[in-house]
Amino acid sequence: VSQLRRDDVDRLFDYGVHIPTRTLWMGTETDEFMAESFLKGLAVLDATSADPITVIMNNIGGDEYHGMAIYDAIATSKSYVTIKAFGHAMSMGSWILQAADERLMAPNATMMLHYGTWNASGPVTEVRVYAAEMERINKLMESAYFPRIRAAKPRFTLKQLQAMLERDTFLTAAESVAMGLADRVL
């Protein structure tokens, strides 16, 4: 094992990326700052080579739009991406996990999935616009989870998934694997 270089350590703590090992960290809620940092790190790693990338996740969820940006970046990466979830893969974090080529969970990690929550105010017409947008996002969420679940459980229905998403559904690492939402427990 080579000795850590000071600039590699600084980059790791400042930006959540360790270039020599092609590892990214996702350890805060999904917001604009985390998303921008993650997207830059992934872009740098993708630009340097197509070698595999590992993402270390401990994510409680957050903003859907920033999460979808991360999801799309991982899904379209030219590199094989493995996400290792430690602690949390909750809400938007569980959705992001589905973008990876390989989805791993630590034995004590917890996954939680649900439809997102929004607050809207204003004239009825404006609230309807937000409701329609939330329904669109819910369909995108279903399309991320459902194929993964069906691969593991061919008889699982979209209605069953929708019932799970109507409330907070917590899964252990082993339950996540059994549901098809993770590939294996570390």
PLM feature segments, named:
Residues V1-L186:
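N-terminal organellar transit peptides
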